[in-house]
Amino acid sequence: KLSAQEWFYYGRELFAHEKQEQAAEVLRAFLENPEGGAENKAEAVRMLAHCLQAAGKEEEGISLLLEGLQFAPPTGEHCCEIGEYFYEKGQWEQAIFWYENALHAERCTEQGAFVQEECYGFLPCIRLCVCYGRLGGWEMAKMYNEMAGVFRPEDASVRQNREYLAKRA
């Protein structure tokens, strides 16, 4: 019989290898086990939500992400997942809230944690640039684009945004 920790690692490996359906089953089993640690539960929720969203179950995925906030303070990855939901729906103010929180979120320091560095810098900055641009906040869009450029100076989207924003701001 697998321990809670082993269920988590197994689900994470399935997720990493893009075996969404199998990962979802294993992650659900892990989340039902009272033995799992809070940070692992929060990460499992994020992965399971991603699996659900990939299967076209966006509403179930976002509900799960929000429920997952009970386990641990949100990481940059968690904030970006929630921000992406609102971004895709064109709900710019809500997306801004989550992407700004991603920039200030604590990284998971648990040994073996998968930390996606882009969720603490480039990704929220480039998304914030677009969100503020969509709202007509050109100066904020410009500021976040330049911040994104600090993380990835040669990124094509940063250059394109720079050209676009030069005409707007």
Language-model segment annotations:
Residues 1, 35, 39, 73-74, ...:
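Short coil turns that delineate tetratricopeptide repeat
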Residues 9, 47, 81-84, 88, ...:
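"A position-specific structural signal for the A-helix of alpha-solenoid helical repeats
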Residues 20-21, 58, 92, 138:
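TPR-repeat structural position
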Residues 5, 39-43, 76-78, 94, ...:
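Start-of-helix register in tetratricopeptide repeats
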